[in-house]
Amino acid sequence: GEILGIAGISGSGQKKLLEAIAGLQSVQSGGHILYHPPAPDEAIAGQHVPVDRAGEELIGKDPLQIRKIGVSLAFVPEDRLGMGLVGDMDMPDNMMLKSYRAGRGPMLDRRAPKTLAQQVKDELEVMTPSLSTPVRRLSGGNVQKVLVGREIASSPTLLMTAYAVRGLDINTSYTIYNLLNEQKKKGVAVV
């Protein structure tokens, strides 16, 4: 994995670029974004061997289409509560938002999201009175930990963050940077 940073002054397009990659913005013009799924013949005796094959175009696909070709996207938007989490919902319900499509039938499994919420709370040291507290009542740093924790828990192949640590205290920023570096070590592409 690797971490790719996109630099520029606020308003120069970083947010729109990430939203376009995620399939949330239409693309008017520009190049191609290709996904090359790993093939068994690429690794011989631990050495990377380039394989000449066509990639899968991501531009113009919505998030479900992108997922169907094997790209597991995780997106941490700039607007934590407007686009990332539902402020009036608690941690378990916000965890469920990422996984509800994987459910079978009309009934939702409420145990798995509650377990994940507890895991995120414990591992990322989210300060909250209880798991049932609406996330809008948490500090900005704790909201960011909940959001990043949920996205990382989805085991993404591509993790995109818009302003990952904007407005956060130094300790929370350090925690978020460590999480991003851990993902890189696991082979995740971080933008």
Listing of model-derived features with the role each one plays in the protein:
Residues G1-V191:
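Glycine-rich phosphate-binding loops of nucleotide-dependent enzymes
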